[in-house]
């Protein structure tokens, strides 16, 4: 994370667990919102926000178990970014979000077919922004789909932007900043904004679970 701004985890889910999450995509009662990306100029594809992550135990367990390590990293970055620290448990963060009017859960599942892609963006959703998020690959690249690489772009003040392509395997997660990361310069730390997106899928189907820890307004 400190060197590149993106880190790939060991496998977090088995193929069976990945399929269990993919299967939820066809259960409309589990979701609060469906976004057809081309209608909003977001790219092409579909994603859905879970109405209550607790209704999908595997998703809720991932959020709760991954959050403490994410909070530890976020709190290491906080003084470097000149930002606040965050509580040690997900429940405390969700309570803070609710007090600020951010009550809509943000975990989502994204589904891309041939030709689908995501434009570069950031997932902010409100005033309270937990600075790290995780995207978990639910299919095997090269076997279930081709193309569809994850693209990250880092804006560097007074320099050209830097692009990175990341290729996680089935069940692996990518940890990356929601907005920016700290970089040590001559006069201390400065913020480098980062955005993320997805290259066009060439064949097959690509599914991803997105875990954003703050809720939305």
PLM region spans:
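Non-heme Fe(II)/2-oxoglutarate
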Residues: 1-93
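Generic detector of contiguous secondary-structure segments
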Residues: 52-64, 95, 114-117, 130-131, ...
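Proline-centered turn/helix-capping motifs that create local helix->coil transitions or kinks
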Residues: 78-83, 140-146
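A short glycine-rich, His/Asp/Glu-containing loop-to-beta-strand
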Residues: 102-114
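A structural signal for short, well-ordered beta-strand segments
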Residues: 107-109, 134-136, 209-213
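Short, conserved beta-strand element in jelly-roll/cupin
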Residues: 111-114, 126-144
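Histidine-centered catalytic micro-motifs
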Residues: 118-125
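Catalytic core of Fe(II)/2-oxoglutarate
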Residues: 130, 141, 145-217
